[in-house]
Amino acid sequence: MAICSFFLQGRCRYGEKCWNEHPRGGSSRYQSQNRYQEPPGNAKGTWGSSSQRYVQPSSFSRSTTWVNRDNEKPSSGSHSGFDNRNVKFTAATGFPSSQNRFAALSSQDNSRDAQTDKGNIIDDITNDMEIWESSGQWMFSVYSMLREKKNISGFADFSPEELRLEYYACQAEGNPLKYINAVQQLGSKWKQRILELKNLNPSSKMALFNELSSPSSDMTSGYNGQQKPAFGSSSFPTNNTAPTAATFSFKADAANAAKAGATNSLAGSNVPAFGNKPTSAPSFGSGGAATAASFSFAPSSSSNFGATTSTSGFGNASNTASFQGTANSAAAPAFGVASSSTAATGFGGGFSTTGAMNTGVRDLFSAGTVGPGPVTSLFVQTTGPLHATASSTSLDGQSFRPSALNTTNSLFTPQNELSAEELAQFKAQRFTLGKIPLKPPPADLLNVS
């Protein structure tokens, strides 16, 4: 370990915490002690006693506040030369002897931490511009000196994906030179801004300081703010107006409806997709204003064939308020087939197969074709027979009689339609894994407790 030269001179301020060696033996120690020890004669004249001896303390033995207590004590004209050196040192620094000699350095550090020097800001910005220009980094990006500061103006922020998208848009337009000119223009603006920041004059420095000190006001929200297009004009037909609850709707606009050539209808009339208020009778047999009770899947009162028949939401006649009543006129139930003269039940019951129909009646989901003339179904176009027997057309185009409705969509399967393996599985107490039948069980094998 090296010997501390300041300790040999008697002015090491670290004391025992010094990282160099302080020798403690031989003549060095004697000289060190003798240096801080006043002559007995001077002490006698000063303190009035020959037994008293004033020893000048070393610099590292002072208090942490570096207050010179020597000025509080009486001193003689023949005092030690060390104190004269101390006074001479403090006078050269320009601070009183009671002040810390290192206070100037600490105050400068605190002031630099409290407020950033403007000269350092200019040096940092100039250095960053030189590095940015020579490093070959991405040009089309913003720059900010500090995280708390706003971005310096004059730089464009475009990602490679945005440039690629703009190139594809210009290529689709058949004008790739537009993309090339735009990129070259952005590159020239970037180089010009770099050159301006590297060579700042006093007026531009003042403008830059004002820009950095002003609060940021050009920041917009990522979801609600309007984003500027990359090259002055957006390639996509966007609407800058944010949608509100009043404008949000699934309803098609008038332009799309005009292009379609017809209104949205289920039964061929002017009925919306999910029903509308009937003109002659409401859905549940009560009049009044349009309420939740008027919501219906039924078509309006005017049918496809010009007949003035009134419909009801659940198959009852429109002249009564019940869900099952006698119909004075031909009523079309919502989910059943057409009936001639009997009452229509809730879901299409009470069929008559022998009545002659004067007008064609059409329900919502299945086309009941009765009477002369062609009848258009919702899904299948069929031609009705010219005889007086009512028939119905299913969704798959197969004609069947109303009396045979429960033969195909039955809840139970007859035993003669099951295979021996399926019948054995139904008769067993538990199904075998991998052999469970997919058909409904027979009614006579069900054991309801």
Curated annotation (Swiss-Prot):
Source species: Xenopus tropicalis (Western clawed frog)
Function: Required for the export of mRNAs containing poly(A) tails from the nucleus into the cytoplasm.
Per-repeat ranges for FG: 231-232, 274-275, 284-285, 305-306, 314-315, 335-336, 347-348
Compositionally biased tracts (Polar residues): 47-83, 218-227
Membrane disposition: Peripheral membrane protein
Record Gene3D superfamilies: Zinc finger, CCCH-type (4.10.1000.10)
Zinc finger (C3H1-type): 1-25
Superkingdom in the source lineage: Eukaryota
Record's comment describing the protein's domains: The FG repeats are interaction sites for karyopherins (importins, exportins) and form probably an affinity gradient, guiding the transport proteins unidirectionally with their cargo through the NPC.
Quaternary structure (record): Probable component of the nuclear pore complex (NPC).
Region (Disordered): 22-84, 218-237
Protein name (record): Nucleoporin NUP42
GO BP, one annotated term: mRNA transport
Location in the cell: Nucleus, Nuclear pore complex; Nucleus membrane
Keywords carried by this UniProt record: Membrane, Metal-binding, mRNA transport, Nuclear pore complex, Nucleus, Protein transport, Repeat, Translocation, Transport, Zinc, Zinc-finger
Keyword ATP-binding on entry: no
